[in-house]
From Swiss-Prot:
Residues 5-109 are annotated as: 15 X 7 AA repeats of S-P-P-S-T-P-V. Keywords: Merozoite, Repeat. Residues 184-203 have a biased composition (Basic residues). Residues 1-108 have a biased composition (Pro residues). The keyword Repeat applies. Sequence repeats lie at residues 5-11, 12-18, 19-25, 26-32, 33-39, 40-46, 47-53, 54-60, 61-67, 68-74, 75-81, 82-88, 89-95, 96-102, 103-109. It comes from Eimeria acervulina (Coccidian parasite). Residues 1-127, 174-203 are annotated as: Disordered. Transmembrane segments: none annotated. This is Merozoite surface protein CMZ-8.
Length: 259
């Protein structure tokens, strides 16, 4: 048992050299503080560039003045709106498409359409026309519920739809018409009947009109009666055939169905 006692003593001295390396850790903490000082001076040059921002705000005010004069030419076309209030005599009889084609009328002058002065700008003309037509159609829809007219508001204007079908007689008797044209015209007829509740399908009414015109099945057919057709046409309504009358916002670009 005596030789085991001496090796217990050399274990204690190596515990002492552990304490001194703890001291050199403190000095490196001091040099961290000085670099915090140079951060403050660069904050000063930020303030001067804020001053030149104010002067460019002044030239914005003068261009606001020339905007007012173009609003004046809208007032003169308000006078020809009064006569269209009379045509409220649509017949209550059901619509029946004619068996004979009606020849398309000559296209109106591009400047004056619906009694609007040609000197007015395109924008003022379209705005005035859209406002007056909306009022007239609201009156017709309220006062003549049994006329067979159905109205559908669209982004391009107003569409007047009837229960009349496309006049397929013209296509079947036209030389050179193919079976594909006849099938397309039949499909277009079904589309026109659904257009009042599905006027967004496949490009809306404008897309339907363009497809129908490309196929050649849309001719200028009569609508309800010649009296109503002439009155509506006087308001800038374009009869595109297949039982569809289309009102454009820009009356200078009226659609007249031609083969």
């Amino acid at each position: 048992p005596l030789p085991f006692s001496p090796p217990s003593t050399p274990v204690s001295p190596p515990s002492t050299p552990v304490s001194p390396p703890s001291t050199p850790v403190s000095p490196p903490s001091t040099p961290v503080s000085p670099p915090s000082t140079p951060v403050s001076p660069p904050s000063t040059p930020v303030s001067p560039p804020s001053t030149p921002v104010s002067p460019p705000s002044t030239p914005v005010s003068p261009p606001s003045t020339p905007v007012s004069p173009p609003s004046t030419p809208v007032s003169p076309p308000s006078t020809p709106v009064s006569p269209p209030s009379t045509p409220v005599s649509p017949p209550s009889t059901p619509v029946s498409p004619p068996s004979t084609p009606v020849s398309p009328p000559s296209s109106p002058a591009p400047g004056a359409v619906g009694g609007v002065n040609s000197s007015l700008s395109q924008r003022s003309t379209s705005e005035h026309w859209h406002a007056s037509v909306s009022v007239q159609f609201e009156r017709w829809r309220d006062r003549t519920p049994a006329s067979g007219l159905r109205f559908a508001p669209l982004a391009e204007g107003w569409a007047i739809l009837t229960a009349a079908s496309c006049n397929l007689h013209n296509i079947r008797q036209r030389p050179g018409s193919s079976a594909a044209d006849r099938r397309h015209c039949t499909r277009s007829t079904r589309s026109s009947r659904r257009m009042s509740r599905r006027h967004r399908h496949k490009g809306g009414l404008r897309g339907f009109v363009s497809r129908c015109r490309r196929s050649g099945c849309c001719r200028f057919s009569s609508f309800a009666s010649p009296t109503i057709r002439s009155k509506l046409t006087g308001y800038g309504v374009a009869d595109v055939g297949c039982g569809v009358l289309f009102v454009l916002r820009h009356t200078a670009r009226r659609i007249l169905a031609r083969s």
